[in-house]
Amino acid sequence: HTRWATHGKVTKENTHPFTSRDDNFAVVHNGIISNYRPLKAQLQKEGFKFSSETDTEVLAHLLEKFYKRSRNVENAFVKMLSLIEGTYAIALISSYHPEQIFCAKKESPLMLGIGDEIKFIGSDFNAFIDHTKNAVILDDREYAIISRDAYVVKDLLSKEEITKPITKIEWDSETSKKGGYPHYMLKEIYEQPQTISNALDLEESGLDEIVDLFAKSKSSYLLGVGTTFYVAKYGKYVFSKLAQEFFPSISSDEFMALANVNKQSLFFCASQSGETFDTLSALKHAKSKGAQTAAVVNVMGSSIARLVDKVVLQGSGPEICVISTKAALSQMVILTVLAMKLAVKKKAITTKTYNQHMLSLRELPGIIQGILNERSGFIHRLAHKYSGTRNWLYLGRGVYYPIALESALKMKEVAYVHAEGMPGGFLKHGTLAMIDDDVSSIVFVPPPEDKDLYEATMHSIEEIRARSGFVLGIHFSEQGKNSDLYSEELILPKVPPLTAPLIQLVIGQLFAYFTATSLKRNVDKPRSLAKSVTVA
C-alpha cells in the first residue's frame, strides 16, 4: 500500500498499515474519514492510545473495540463501517482469521483480482495484472471477504451475498512495462501515435450517441480537473470553432459554485482513471438533478464509466506515469471528432469538410512519429540548456491557450519548475511587469494560415522582445521568417490549423520531460502527486 498524505505528514509514524492496540487487527486505507476527530476523541476517553496523526488509525482501534463485543471479525468490520463517514477503500487482516482479507469501499476504487488459487485486492487493475486478468469491481456500500481459493461479496446493510460479474482486463502486463524506455512518461509520449489511431478507430455509433446528447441538450458543460480541465477547455474551443456552439468548461472542483443543473443539461467529462473524486462528485450531483451525463475515460469498469448515461472508452492502454500525456492527447482528439460530428449534424460544416478534417487527423500519428524520431534530440538539448530557468511563461491564443496551460502544468508537475500558462493578451494587463532576466517565455505560434491568431501571437512576442525578454518560439513557419523575434526557435512541419495545437502539446510534454531528467527529478512519481486523485 502506498500512502498519499491527507492527514498527517509523511513520516514513519503516519505510515500504513495501522494495528490495533492488541495487534490482532491491521488496516490500510485510501480516502478520508471525515468524522475521525469525534471518533478519535471517544476512543481516547475509553483509554485507546494513538501513535499517529492519521484518520486511518481510528479504524484499527474501532475494530478491536467492536470485536470484544461480538467476538466476530465480520460483525466488527460491518459495525465499524456503519460508523465512519467520508470516502474509503479499506483492507483488513486479523490474527483471528489469518487466511482471509476483509475489504470495503465507498467513493474510492476497489476491485478483486480472481485467480484460480489466489485472490487479490487493489485500487487498480495494474496491481494484479501479472497474476490474473479476471476482476470483480466492488460498488459503494459493498464489502468482500477473500481467501486463497474463495471470495464472497456482500451488501453492507443486509449482509446478504451479492453475485458480481467478472470483468476481463483487456491489456496484459507487457503493455504496463517500460519496454526499454528510461521512464514510463517517455514511453507513453512515444505511444501517442498509436493512441491517436486508437481514438480515431472508436466505434462510430457510440460517438454518435453522445453527439445526439449534445444536440438535444439546452445547455452543455465540459468537465475535468487538472489536466482534464485543460482537455475540457480545449474542447470548448473546438466546439465553438467547428460546431459554432459555446459549451462552458468547468473545473470539477468548482462545479457546485458554477453549474446551473437541470433536466435539460448535459455534463460531459474527461477522466483518465474514471475515479477522480471531484469529477465523480460533480457527475453524481448532476444526475441527482436529472441531468444527462457522458464521459470519455481510459479505464473500463471505473466508477465514472459505470455512472454516466453514455461513455467512450478511449482505448489508450494503461498509463502508468503519474503525469498524464497520452490519455490527455487522445481525449483531445476524441473531443475534436465529437465537435466535427456535431458540426455536420448542425450543418455548420459540410460532409466534405468533415472528411478533410478526418484526413488531417488520420495523418497526425505519422507526423507526430516523425517529430519524435527527428526532433527529440534537439528538444533534449534545448531543455538541458535552459534547465536552470526557474520561471517560465507559457503563452497561447485561442485554442493554443489550453495547450499553454497543459504544457505549463507538465513543467510544474514533473520538473518542479514554476510555470504559468496564460493567453497572450494577458501580457499587457499586468504580466509584462514580470519580464526580466529571471522570467522566460515559451510561445505556441499558430500556422500563418490561421491569420488572426497568428498575427495576435506575433504581437505578443514583439511585446516581450521589446522588453528584452527571452522567447522560445514553437512555430510552423519556414526557417528565417521572423527568426529575429525569437531567442530560440523550434520549427515544426507544416500542418493544417486543426491539428497544429495537438502537435505543439507533444512538444510541451517533451520539453517538460527533458527538463525534469536534466534536473534529475523522479519523473514517473513526482513528489506529492498521485495518479488517481480519489480524495476531496
Please tell me what each predicted stretch does:
Residues 185, 191-221, 289, 310-442, ...:
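Active-site phosphate/pyrophosphate-binding segments
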Residues 215-363, 397, 444-493, 511, ...:
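Glycine-rich phosphate-binding loops that contact phosphosugars or nucleotide phosphates
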Residues 30-34, 103-112, 181-185, 229-235, ...:
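Conserved phosphate/anionic-ligand binding catalytic regions in large, soluble enzymes, centered on
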Residues 1-13, 197-212, 236-276, 418-434:
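Glycine-rich oxoanion-binding loops at beta->alpha junctions
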Residues 1-183, 187-219, 230, 351, ...:
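Conserved short alpha-helical segments that host acidic/polar catalytic motifs at enzyme active sites
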Residues 84-118, 387-413, 444-445, 451-453, ...:
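Acidic/histidine-rich
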Residues 4-6, 23, 32-34, 38, ...:
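Short, glycine-/Ser/Thr-/acidic-enriched flexible segments
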